[in-house]
């Protein structure tokens, strides 16, 4: 009996080891630990990457040169970062393509409570994350819409902080006077009885951005098609699972963001799963086109370019034709 039990244990171990060896490795980076990353976390926690034959290593690399360098070198195969950085890099010759989105962002321009009107922002300092990021472009576009010339009427300070909640704390420390924040940042500030002034809603200003995007090297998409498809299938199923199974999404928020406050979790779920995530996370072509138009004056390589030049939708189109999204609907429809 003991021998039989030992053999059984060994066989189970070997089976698991063989299964693990059959999974293909994939390195995926994302820029910051924010609620918008929830599809990656659900896919990881629910075993969806393994379902589609992948052993995925999730890595945090701040948006900017480090992230672009990691994608260019092949250290990561999938990059979760603002599409503007990918687009600019591609325009300058790197073989990158935007392949998906984390959904639209809902940015607000918030200021220190001592600043009570938009005009009082003149001569002050607005904090961004890093140069060349979506936050910088969106901030500057908002300031122009509000009648300011960035760099002249208002100082722009790169804080180096991709997380908007951390930039908000820098604002309360007096190092900056305003920054872009998300709805859950506002909720958190309210919970802590921290006052602030809401100066503008970027959507109301007609400024639309993505929360972040998914990008890959074009040669990877061709030569490693199975891995690229597996990733996007797991990513998409995570979205469907998160919308249909609230408890699964909340479990990932708790684990990855170390958040246990019920009210905060509800806010995260509403803002980043229900309101933001599209069931078919195609690249946001209109947003990318707007970025091109706004960046052409500072990035001459973008002149004459269209959003389609920086997008690869072929895997999603294949999945559509194969009935993948119909299967998701049949599986997760309530």
Residue ranges and their predicted role:
Residues 57, 65, 155-158, 267-273, ...:
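Short linear loop/turn motifs
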Residues 84-85, 163-258:
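Pocket-lining segment of extracytoplasmic ligand-binding domains
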Residues 222-304:
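Secondary-structure end/capping motifs
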Residues 293-334:
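Conserved C-terminal helix/tail region of periplasmic/extracytoplasmic solute-binding proteins
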């Amino acid at each position: 009996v003991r021998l039989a039990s030992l053999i059984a244990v060994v066989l189970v171990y070997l089976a698991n080891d063989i299964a693990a060896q059959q999974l293909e490795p994939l390195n995926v980076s994302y820029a910051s630990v924010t609620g918008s990353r929830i599809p990656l976390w659900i896919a990881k926690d629910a075993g969806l990457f393994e379902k589609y034959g992948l052993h995925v290593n999730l890595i945090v690399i701040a948006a900017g040169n480090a992230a672009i360098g990691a994608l260019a070198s092949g250290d990561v195969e999938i990059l979760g970062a603002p599409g503007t950085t990918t687009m600019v890099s591609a325009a300058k010759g790197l073989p990158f393509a935007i392949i998906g989105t984390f959904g639209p962002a809902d940015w607000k321009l918030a200021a220190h409570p001592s600043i009570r009107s938009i005009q009082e922002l003149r001569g002050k300092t607005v904090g961004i994350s890093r140069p060349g990021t979506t936050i910088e472009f969106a901030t500057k576009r908002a300031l122009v819409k509000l009648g300011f010339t960035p760099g002249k009427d208002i100082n722009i300070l790169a804080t180096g902080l991709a997380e908007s909640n951390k930039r908000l704390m820098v604002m309360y420390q007096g190092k900056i006077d305003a920054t872009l924040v998300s709805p859950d940042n506002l909720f958190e500030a309210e919970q802590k009885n921290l006052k602030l002034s809401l100066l503008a809603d970027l959507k109301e200003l007609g400024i639309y951005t993505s929360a972040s995007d998914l990008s890959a090297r074009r040669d990877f998409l061709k030569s490693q098609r199975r891995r690229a498809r597996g990733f996007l299938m797991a990513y998409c199923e995570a979205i469907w699972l998160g919308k249909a199974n609230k408890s699964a999404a909340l479990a990932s928020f708790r684990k990855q963001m170390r958040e246990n406050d019920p009210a905060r979790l509800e806010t995260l779920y509403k803002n980043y799963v229900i309101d933001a995530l599209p069931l078919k996370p195609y690249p946001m072509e209109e947003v990318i086109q707007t970025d091109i138009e706004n960046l052409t004056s500072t990035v001459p390589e973008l002149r004459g370019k269209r959003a389609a030049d920086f997008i690869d939708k072929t895997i999603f189109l294949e999945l559509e034709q194969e009935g993948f999204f119909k299967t998701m609907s049949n599986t997760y429809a309530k």
